[in-house]
Amino acid sequence: MESTIGIDAGGTLTKIAYLNEKKKLTFEKFYSNEQDKIIDWLKKQTSIKQICITGGKAKQLQQLLSDSYKIVELNEFEATLVGVRYILKEEKYDINNFVLTNIGTGTSIHYIYNDRYIRAGGTGVGGGTIMGLSKLLTNIDHFEDVIPLTKVGSRKDLDITVGDIYGGILSPIDNSLTASNFGKAATIESNYNNSDILATVQGLVGEVVTALSLQFAETKNIGHIIYIGSTLCNNIHLQNIISSYTKYQNKTPIFLRDGGNSGAIGALLYATNKKS
């Protein structure tokens, strides 16, 4: 039986969504610079005839696949929205208007009004920042190695909080808020362990991304912010940072179970619906 798959070729990761033999939605993930592994996997799936591809590296991958498959290309923002809408329905959310923050290699932020999306903005701070700083500061360069260390790390010896500055005096804002990411490293000599450094890197990224998302949400008086992206996958530390900061500003954070695969899901659904 001929089949269709969706591919989201991102800056760092390439995600694949397809229906297995039991018609269950299934995912695969590869590093985007490992194109040989992607092609080898595709060759083993002999039933695949059509691929809907999206993402920043879609053109590069498409050039390698166009002779073997029927290729449909889809704008990555459209694919992501289709995927997010599908996941929201599957997870029983009834939300039409929200801010969508996609934390990939960098971070893009959109306003979503029903099935219409408007780009609000973005930042170069994202998953690529986490991995770049992790490599520079600890020489750890695999996301899978960063996550477990981050879980046991602490930011208290590296970040300066509002409470640190006010020193017990009543402050105008919450003492636990970060006044300066990595600020203590400039004034306190210490051999910081990798866990604390990695936790602080994620704190920096999480707070920058959340602050920007909150500003956009507040501008349009939107109450829900949906955070997606592979950077959040199994990353409880980063999710907790984002969640607590979002709630502090009286907005509702939502993390979708398969949010990191939303682009690939959207590509699959688009091609499947178009085919039918």
From Swiss-Prot:
GO terms for molecular function: ATP binding; pantothenate kinase activity. This is Type II pantothenate kinase. Pfam families: Fumble. It comes from Bacillus cereus (strain AH820). Keywords: ATP-binding, Coenzyme A biosynthesis, Cytoplasm, Kinase, Nucleotide-binding, Transferase. It is found in: Cytoplasm. Catalyzes the phosphorylation of pantothenate (Pan), the first step in CoA biosynthesis. Belongs to the type II pantothenate kinase family. NCBIfam families: panK_eukar, PRK13317.1. One of its GO terms (cellular component) is cytosol. It catalyses: (R)-pantothenate + ATP = (R)-4'-phosphopantothenate + ADP + H(+). Its main location: cytoplasm. The active site is at E76. Its EC number is 2.7.1.33. ATP binds at residues 8-15, 105, 127-131, 143, 230. One of its GO terms (biological process) is coenzyme A biosynthetic process. Pathway: Cofactor biosynthesis; coenzyme A biosynthesis; CoA from (R)-pantothenate: step 1/5. It is an enzyme of class 2 (transferase). The lineage of its organism: Bacteria, Bacillati, Bacillota, Bacilli, Bacillales. Homodimer.
